[in-house]
């Protein structure tokens, strides 16, 4: 039975990456929405799985589309439907649940290890190298399990029940996506970056092969 996977994309250089590959591999149908550009969101009834990607905006921004996304997230939560939030998307889930989005203790832009904090989802390595592109984080919902931490920022991911995952970092970019992120938003890496990596270094690092596998594992877990 195929699923309709609705992806909310907010930055032209931050697309679904390997999430698209997962949709194809599982015979699911992916629909990409750009709510900040076109003001259109799917309904909960036409959403089997919701993916909320990163954004240069913050959930704290007083914008209609930002608030409307949280209305959709709330309906998804109420119906126990699967949600994957990445970066801004993870923060949107937490804010929907009433938690704060605040400045992280460090601005992380580039590649850095994340460490698995919970064994509920099997088949994930204890340590992975992920792409970070953020300076804010959310509080971890008390009803959720802390899923990942980095050396500089504890709140890197959470698992809520068996159907909602929030990640503060990026497992989804493949190498083409990393180039697209870094060449278009490279200035962000050069300002007060606690990982001290340049756009060129970020691109040349390459993508660890495991990251796509873990992305598939996480999506399979919430989609089951």
Residue ranges and their predicted role:
Residues 2-6:
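Extreme N-terminal starter segment of soluble prokaryotic enzymes
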Residues 7, 102, 116-224:
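Amide-donor transfer/coupling interface in amidating biosynthetic enzymes
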Residues 8-10, 35, 88, 169:
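Cofactor-binding loop segments of dinucleotide-utilizing enzymes, especially the Rossmann-like FAD-
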Residues 14-18:
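Short N-terminal binding/cap micro-motifs at the start of the first secondary-structure element
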Residues 24-84:
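Flexible gly/pro-rich beta->alpha loop and the following alpha-helix that scaffold active-site loops
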Residues 29-37, 113, 130, 147-150:
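Short gly/ser/thr-rich secondary-structure transition/capping motifs
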Residues 61-65, 105, 125:
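Short, solvent-exposed loop/turn segments at secondary-structure boundaries
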Residues 76-100:
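Catalytic nucleophile loop
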């Amino acid at each position: 039975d195929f699923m309709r996977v609705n992806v909310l994309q907010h930055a032209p250089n931050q697309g679904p990456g390997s999430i698209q590959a997962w949709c194809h591999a599982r015979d699911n149908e992916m629909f990409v929405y750009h709510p900040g550009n076109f003001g259109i969101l799917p309904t909960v009834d036409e959403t089997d799985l919701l993916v909320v990607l990163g954004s240069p905006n913050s959930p704290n921004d007083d914008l209609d589309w930002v608030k409307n996304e949280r209305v959709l997230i709330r309906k998804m939560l109420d119906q126990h439907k699967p949600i994957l939030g990445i970066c801004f998307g993870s923060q949107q889930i937490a804010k929907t649940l009433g938690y704060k989005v605040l400045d992280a203790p460090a601005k992380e832009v580039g590649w850095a290890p994340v460490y698995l904090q919970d064994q509920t989802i099997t088949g994930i390595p204890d340590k992975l190298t992920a792409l970070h592109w953020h300076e804010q984080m959310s509080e971890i919902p008390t009803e959720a399990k802390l899923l990942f931490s980095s050396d500089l920022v504890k709140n890197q991911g959470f698992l809520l029940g068996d159907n909602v995952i929030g990640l503060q970092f990026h497992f989804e970019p493949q190498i083409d996506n990393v180039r697209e992120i870094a060449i278009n938003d490279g200035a962000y890496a050069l300002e007060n970056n606690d990982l001290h990596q340049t756009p060129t270094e970020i691109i040349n690092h390459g993508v660890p092969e495991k990251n796509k596998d873990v992305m598939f594992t996480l999506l399979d877990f919430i989609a089951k």
